[in-house]
Amino acid sequence: MTGSDGKVRVAMIGAGVMSNRVHYPSLASFEDVEIAAICDIDTERLRVTADQYAVEKRYLDYRTMVEEIAPDAVYAIGQPHIFYDIWTWCLEQGQNLYIEKPMGITLHHARSLAHLAEKHGCITQVSFQRRSTPLVSKLHAACLQRGPIVHAVCRFYKCAMDPYLEARDHMMDDGVHAIDTLRWMCGGEVVNVHSVVKRVGVPDINFFSALLEFDNGATGLMINSWTSGRRIFDVEMHAPGICAEAEHEGTGTLYIDGDTQGVTYDTREVAGSDAFHTYGGFESKNREFIDCLKAGTLPGSHFGDAVKTMEVAETILAQATLKGI
């Protein structure tokens, strides 16, 4: 799996904003990882990124890069409606693959990717990094010490009142984050979905709420709104005699046995860093993928798991369609 120097060799497709903000710095921080080559059709972005990370091998064609470099894994970070064909090609070559969310923009995309990954034995990861934020991971573990999660809540609000006219809708852009975070917090499999959605002042759906029932008895509640006055992403986790409330990029408080003061933790202090890619969970998500490459195992957000998040998202949208919304 690794090169002669023991490092995992990674080939990067894409040198855009997201990659440069969180994935390149995460990978560059790992002593056992080599960014072996970079590909981008924008020559200036390619030059700037490759120079910053001292990467000699630079390509405009991803197929040529993968064939010549023969990496241990490919990172293909870009818009899902543009990158879907790149992802399928990589999987058909048997390449281990890391992508950003969403896992395509339709359930057909997601199921096809999961099928190809399983068929070709690829180790994959969708970057649902809110599962691995150090602060929330710490609070989640503390709750589980008291017993299974009874119920969890995820709120994701933004102030974005204009019509959303991208290739993907609000659900696939942001809603999947809330669904996936709830799935991780609650554990188990979603067995029932009850939803209410709205169109508030725009032609597209910009309000989602759903109650998710899990086969382990846990209940998850998500509320996503782009009609709010500010951005919020926060969670609650409740287990017997304990609860946690947290904003991934701010603070989290743990309450035990009726205490109303709680113990508050700062996300940067828990992560031990002021770097966004670290306290935001991206470094941990990348580390999980690299470790699984070395061990030959599947990480938590492999395509076979991430497709379940997409299925819940499509269920909510289907319920809206059946209601005539």
Residue ranges, per PLM feature:
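Contiguous beta-strand/loop segments that form the cofactor/metal-binding neighborhood of enzyme cores
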Residues: 179-253, 279, 283-297
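C-terminal helix-rich "cap/oligomerization" subdomain common to oxidoreductases
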Residues: 1-7, 73-75, 122, 215, ...
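A contiguous active-site-proximal alpha/beta segment in oxidoreductase catalytic domains
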Residues: 81, 104-162
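Beta-loop-alpha module in the N-terminal Rossmann-like domain of NAD(P)-dependent dehydrogenases
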Residues: 42, 53, 57-116
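Active-site loop of classical SDR/Rossmann-like NAD(P)-dependent oxidoreductases
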Residues: 18, 273-287, 301
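Oxidoreductase and adenylate-handling cofactor-binding alpha/beta cores
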Residues: 132-153, 172-198, 211-218, 319
